Structures are given as structure tokens and as C-alpha cells.
Regions:
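Short helix-terminating capping/connector loops at secondary-structure junctions
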Residues: 52-56
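Short glycine-rich, Thr/Ser-proximal phosphate-binding strand/loop in the N-terminal lobe
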Residues: 2-40, 73-74, 144, 148
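Short glycine-rich anion-binding loops that position phosphate/pyrophosphate groups of nucleotides
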Residues: 64-67, 131-133
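Glycine-rich phosphate-binding loop and adjoining helix at the ATP-binding site
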Residues: 32, 36-43, 47, 57-59, ...
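Glycine-rich phosphate-binding loop of actin/hexokinase-like ATP-binding domains
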Residues: 122-148
Length: 148
């Protein structure tokens, strides 16, 4: 089982999935629009799921904006400015006392489609997210392409 969290400008949505994709739990709260409260809310979400299912679980989080590969800072999260210039991956990993995989939401969307979505039979996948903001993700051979 794994926990997936979608951190957005308006909501934080969590899902607990079995390895076969079966959804066991889903929850949604409003984004607090404050960095430390975001860290605290996600930590509480994970702790509550783990308490309910009596397991320590892997956690993956998609977020708006990109991560500067040199500094680890989130940048260009235009509709979630409280995330900008923060080391989100480092901070949430520290708060949860484990390595948490964090990635741009559009990259996660494109990767998901490449593995088990409508693009699973294609070598190259480009996904666009239109929500509170707009973003794109490119996947080639089931690997996210990251660059400037």
C-alpha cells in the first residue's frame, strides 16, 4: 500500500492505494495557504491513515511549481505562493521521518498516464494540467524528463 497526496492551490487530497490500484481510503481538505500549516496538515493526514491501517507506508506527493535541482527550492508555484522558495521535499521528509518522493503535479500526471492510463502503449507522453494553474509534463520511455 502507498499514500499519494495531491497538494494544490485549493486542496490537499490524499489516497491510499493497494499495489493493484484498489483505492482503500480517500480524503480531501482545503489548502491552508500557509507553508508550515501545509507541512503540519500533510503530516497529520499521513499519521491518521497509518493509524487507521496500522502500517507505516510509502508517501508520494505531487505539488505545483518546479523544484530547483541545485537548491531544492520550489519555484514558479504561481497560485500557491506560500510554497515558493521553500525546501518542501526536505521539510516534509523531516516531518514524516522518512524519505518522501515529491514531484511536480504535471509530471506525475504524465507519468501516471504513461504507466497505466490512456497513454500506456506509447513511448512519448506529454500531459497538460489545467486547474488553478497550468503545467505540463513530458515522459519518454516511462521516465520523467526534467530540465530547465
Amino acid at each position: 500500500m502507498q499514500i499519494g497526496i495531491d497538494l494544490g492551490a485549493t486542496k490537499i487530497e490524499s489516497v491510499l492505494l493497494k499495489e493493484n490500484g484498489l483505492e482503500l481510503h480517500r480524503d480531501r481538505i482545503q489548502s491552508p495557504k500557509n507553508y508550515q500549516k501545509t507541512i503540519n496538515d500533510i503530516t497529520n493526514i499521513v499519521n491518521n491513515i497509518e493509524k487507521k491501517f496500522k502500517k507505516n507506508l510509502n508517501v508520494g506527493i505531487c505539488h505545483p511549481g518546479s523544484t530547483n535541482l541545485e537548491t531544492g527550492f520550489i519555484q514558479n508555484a504561481f497560485n500557491s505562493p506560500w510554497l515558493n522558495n521553500q525546501t518542501f521535499s526536505k521539510d516534509i521528509s523531516k516531518s514524516l521521518n522518512r524519505n518522501v518522493i515529491c514531484e511536480n503535479d504535471a509530471n506525475c500526471f504524465a507519468l501516471s498516464e504513461a504507466f497505466d492510463g490512456s497513454a500506456k502503449n506509447f513511448k512519448t507522453v506529454f500531459g497538460i494540467i489545467l486547474g488553478s494553474g497550468c503545467g505540463g509534463g513530458l515522459v519518454i520511455d516511462k521516465k520523467i524528463i526534467i530540465g530547465p
